[in-house]
Structures are given as C-alpha cells and as structure tokens.
Swiss-Prot record:
Subcellular location, record wording: Cytoplasm
GO terms for cellular component: cytoplasm; cytosol
GO molecular function, one term: ferroxidase activity
Family statement: Belongs to the ferritin family. Prokaryotic subfamily.
Keywords associated with the record: Cytoplasm
Annotated protein name in UniProt: Bacterial non-heme ferritin-like protein
Coiled coil: none
TM region positions: none
All residue ranges annotated as the Ferritin-like diiron domain in the record: 1-145
Domain of life according to the entry: Bacteria
Amino acid sequence: MATAGMLLKLNSQMNREFYASNLYLHLSNWCSEQSLNGTATFLRAQAQSNVTQMMRMFNFMKSVGATPIVKAIDVPGEKLNSLEELFQKTMEEYEQRSSTLAQLADEAKELNDDSTVNFLRDLEKEQQHDGLLLQTILDEVRSAKLAGMCPVQTDQHVLNVVSHQLH
C-alpha cells in the first residue's frame, strides 16, 4: 500500500504530466503559427499522451484510496526561435519528469510497495520510448540545420522521422 508521502509525490508527478501536456500544446501552437504543421501535429499527439499518463496516475491513486488533486498551472509562455530550441526544451522537460519518475519507483521499491513499483515501472517504459523519440528528433533537427534545410523542410523531415519511428 502506498504511504501518504508516496501519494503526495505521485500527485506531484501527475501534475508534472499535466504541465507537460500544456507545454506541448503551447509548443504545438507556436509550430502552427510558423506553418510547421507536421511538428504541430506531433506535439499535439504528445500532449494527448501526457494527458493519458496523467489519467493513469489519477486512476491508480483513486484505486489505492487517495484523493488526487490536479492543480492550476501557469501557462508556458516562453518565446521560441527555432525547432532546435523547441525540441531542446521538450528534452529538458522530459528529463525532469523521467528523473522524478525513476526516483519515485526507487522509493516505492525501498518501501516494498510492489503495486506502486509495478505501476511506475510500466510508466517508465512508456516514457523511455518517448525520450528516445524526442532525442532522435532533436538530433535530426540539428542535422537538418547543419545541412542548411529551411524550417518547413525540417518540419517535413520531422514528420517522416516520427512516422518511421512509430511504424
């Protein structure tokens, strides 16, 4: 059974997923404004994935008798200048969420809370896939920049990379 402290940390992680979904929607909007529609579509799908993770955490917490609390968040509003900057930001955010998720899993293991450990390890596996995809995209965006591709060409390249990775 999850301890009260663990449940508070799970609640915080759930809110990180909520923040990530909002961040990805914000970044998607920026891409749409730049006519980078392939990347915008990818980021909206990532936002949906984060909402799904958030709901899984919400449901897990309810199943163990907790009362999850989704908190209000500040809307991300940073100015972006490039796809490279955008994907660097997504990687930084991903690494923060991934790190705290791993810490939670380790802590649950120390508490011998097997159901929480199993739940968190499943989430970690899913997030690792997302992290590999984001890193691949960032690497490809950097390569496209070095090759002199314009943003619209890079956007199309990102869409091709995502399509290839998902199939």
